């Protein structure tokens, strides 16, 4: 039951962070491209890589993995919003932005997971 509460706590923090970061990115860059979703996916991917690496090295407890890896990062990152925003760009005829959105999210998020892992593994 403790892990369920930790996931809920982490999820509430991640959801609020996602909301605040998305609003911030709209204020900075406007709403013509989904920069907020890209930012939270990149940040979450990097942190997920780091949490995974720490878990592999047994430096974090299962409770912390539940709090951060499942709760916080699960709520912070968002594949459904990414998919919806990409579809909206396609429906508006903005093919170049839709393709850019897919390429940036997929390639950069994969790289950020790798970078997060390497940051931790290189310090061991």
Curated annotation (Swiss-Prot):
The chain crosses the membrane at residues 20-40, 60-80, 102-122. It comes from the Bacteria. GO terms for biological process: cellular detoxification of fluoride. GO terms for cellular component: plasma membrane. It is found in: Cell inner membrane. It catalyses: fluoride(in) = fluoride(out). Belongs to the fluoride channel Fluc/FEX (TC 1.A.43) family. HAMAP family: FluC. This is Fluoride-specific ion channel FluC. It comes from Shewanella frigidimarina (strain NCIMB 400).
